[in-house]
Regions:
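A hydrophobic transmembrane-helix motif
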Residues: 72, 76, 83-85, 116, ...
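Cytosolic ends of transmembrane helices, especially the final helix of ABC transmembrane type-1 domains
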Residues: 131, 243-247, 258, 273-279, ...
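Short intracellular "coupling" helices and adjacent cytoplasmic loop segments at the cytosolic face
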Residues: 30-36, 98-100, 130-133, 143-170, ...
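An intracellular "coupling" helix at the cytosolic face of ABC transporter transmembrane type-1 domains
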Residues: 172-178, 248-269, 275-322, 364-367, ...
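ABC-family ATPase nucleotide-binding domain "signature/switch" substructure
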Residues: 453, 490, 523-624
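Membrane-integrated ABC transporters
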Residues: 1-81, 90-110, 124-128, 154-192, ...
Length: 642
């Protein structure tokens, strides 16, 4: 089970610098609010570090082509808007003059304009969603690749940080985080071009407004433009002020939703244990608490939406009326035609909408902010694991090659937690080909942690773990993983099901006592729920015999089996894989009979230490003696059964 080096991670992620010190270790000089704001600001920066690679990666030319095409379509669409605005003036002037010929002529012109505008809108949606789809696919591939590299998905469970529910962040938050920016950028470009175009229209049509107040006369040049700017400034400022807590509330809501889903998932995944223990009431209490948090956050979000709706809804009602009221004096004194009034009203609405883009998009902007930060938090936690594997900060366990006849060696190996707390201290072990080594010790002495360090899943510590370069490692955990799909796929995992024939997999199932499932190898079912704990462990041994590795690591791999079944599995390991090297972690004393050495870990103040390395069977002739012992044990057991 070799682990790819960190250098193989995507180039776009290699250059990520550590976050500022105040993010990793809060500065006493900063208030909690300032520290939190610094963290939020960095998270957005971290998101863009990952996200911008889409335009420079393989396929970046296509991304740029879609982006440039989208901008071109937006510009063309604004041009059509201007043409329709001019048509609006002409049609109302013709109606005012009761010019039927012009009305019919302009009606004929309208249909090509409408068809062109609709076509542009359709192509604009295609380009916009094309960018969103491709960006999401690219960033998802990048995040999932890093999440699945070097066991990061597992290591995240071992370290502190804001990375809970990574599956929800990848599936949902990442979708929002890539969809919204494309909408925002296209919206801003459209708003800017629309504002620039129709401000000219307002300035040209409206001209200056002369006001008399207190005997004094005032002239306001471009009064319609001034009114549009003032109105947009008031509504935007009101929206920013009223919605200033929207981002935090939206982020808390998303987190509460994720925790609620996780609580429900836990019940489904552990249904048997909960049912056997009668823990329904306790689980209901936990679910109710997480759901109460969801309702509380939804209530807060509802309040935010209600406040921002006051501004957005009020603006949408008032905006069309203002230009009519402002143009009414000029229309009534005959200095402005009906067509000019309608053109000005349309232009004012477009300008106000452009200036009020923030008003209309503030809630979604807040939601994007929260989702982007959740993705960035996940990436930042993975960054920390990468730094740990490179040896930045606390020590890193080195991985190398053995010398001489050794298949596996631990050289001055110390294993620590991610904060530097010692778990295992200064382990020195050399294991030769064909040895069966049992790692024993009290619960909590770090046996499983030591095994994870050997397998490469635990990077924190010092010293080195060395393997023979030509030997393959295979690990059997206490809870074997059963993937979705057919039983054939589950038996072959992590290799492809097609790597072995149905007959070969059937033989392996026969060996481990699962022959009754041979006829169901191609059946797709929820096998993780169908198989018992013991059957899953038998299936794991079937995988082992199919893969035929050189080094086997067993981490409580027979804990769900009865003594007879356990003996059978261990006898099969010795029979089917006589030359393999085995390292086992177990509590059952009976397993000593299947091993040639026992390493004992003992808890000490500075971390567990290897206090004894015992030969269970003399090394000279150990395989012959072990084989004889196992035959005698089996014969005696059969006699007792008779």
């Amino acid at each position: 089970m070799p682990k790819p080096p960190v250098a193989e991670v995507a180039e776009t992620e290699q250059a990520v610098e550590p976050p500022p010190p105040e993010i990793l270790e809060p500065d006493a000089a900063l208030s909690p609010e300032e520290t939190e704001q610094a963290r939020r600001d960095y998270l957005l920066t971290r998101f863009w570090i990952s996200g911008k690679g889409f335009w420079g990666a393989n396929g970046g030319k296509l991304a740029w082509a879609f982006s440039i095409g989208l901008i071109f379509l937006i510009i063309t669409n604004v041009a059509f808007q201007y043409a329709i605005n001019v048509w609006n003036r002409a049609i109302f002037d013709a109606i005012e003059k009761r010019d039927s010929a012009s009305v019919f002529y302009l009606t004929g012109i309208f249909f090509p304009l409408a068809i062109g505008s609709v076509a542009l809108g359709v192509f604009q949606v295609f380009a916009r969603m094309g960018i969103q789809r491709r960006w999401r696919a690219w960033l998802t591939d990048s995040v999932v690749s890093r999440w699945l590299t070097n066991g990061r998905y597992y290591q995240l469970n071992l370290v502190s940080g804001d990375h809970e529910n990574p599956e929800y962040r990848i599936a949902e938050d990442l979708r929002v985080a890539t969809d919204a920016p494309v909408d925002f950028v296209s919206g801003v470009i459209s708003a800017f071009l629309s504002a620039a175009t129709f401000i000219v229209v307002l300035w040209t049509i409206g001209g200056a407004l002369t006001l008399t107040f207190g005997g004094s006369t005032f002239t306001v040049p471009g009064f319609l433009v001034v009114a549009a700017v003032i109105y947009a400034a008031v509504t935007s400022t009101s929206m920013v002020y009223i919605g200033r807590h929207f981002v935090a509330v939206s982020e808390n809501k998303n987190q509460a939703e994720a925790e609620y889903r996780y609580a429900l998932t836990r019940v489904r995944e552990n249904g048997e244990s909960i049912a056997l223990l009668g823990g329904e009431e306790e689980e209901r209490d936990g679910i109710d608490k997480t759901f109460a948090s969801v309702i509380k956050q939804w209530a807060l979000l509802c309040g935010q939406h209600m406040r921002t709706t006051i501004v957005s809804q009020g603006s949408s009602l008032i905006a069309p009326v203002i230009p009519l009221l402002l143009c009414a004096p000029k229309f009534l004194d005959g200095s402005m035609t009906l067509g000019q009034v309608m053109q000005a009203a349309s232009a004012f609405t477009i300008v106000q909408s452009a200036f009020g883009w923030l008003v209309d998009n503030y809630p979604r902007l807040a939601d994007w902010n929260a989702c982007a930060r959740r993705i960035a938090s996940l990436m930042m936690s993975i960054d920390g694991l990468d730094r740990a594997e490179r040896g930045d900060g606390i020590g890193r366990i080195q991985r190398g090659e053995t010398e001489g006849d050794a298949v596996l060696s631990l050289n001055d190996l110390s294993v620590t937690l991610d904060d530097g707390t010692a778990v295992v201290e200064e382990a020195e072990v050399i294991i030769e080909s064909g040895e069966r080594v049992l790692v024993a010790g009290e619960s909590g002495t770090g046996k499983s942690t030591l095994v994870r360090a050997i397998a490469g899943l635990w990077p924190w510590g010092d010293g080195s773990v060395n393997f023979h370069p030509d030997r393959r490692l295979f690990m059997l955990p206490q809870k074997p993983y059963v993937p979705f799909g057919s039983l054939r796929r589950a038996a072959a995992y992590p290799a492809a099901a097609e790597d072995w024939t149905i007959e070969e997999i059937g033989v392996a199932l026969d060996k481990v006592g699962l022959g009754h499932l041979k006829e169901r190898l191609e059946e797709e079912a929820p096998w993780d729920q169908t198989l018992s704990g013991g059957e899953k462990q038998r299936l794991a041994f079937a995988r082992l015999f199919l893969h035929n590795p050189d080094i086997i690591v067993l981490d409580e791999a027979t804990s769900a089996l009865d003594a007879k079944s356990q003996d059978k599995m261990m006898e099969l390991v010795n029979k089917e894989l006589p030359n393999a090297t085995v390292v086992s972690v177990a509590h059952r004393v009976e397993l000593e009979a299947f091993h040639t050495r026992k390493i004992v870990l003992e808890r000490r103040k500075g971390g567990a230490k290897l206090v004894s390395d015992i030969d269970l069977i003399p090394r000279k002739g150990k395989r012959r003696l072990l084989s004889r012992f196992l035959r005698q044990r089996k014969t005696g057991r059969e006699a007792n059964e008779r």
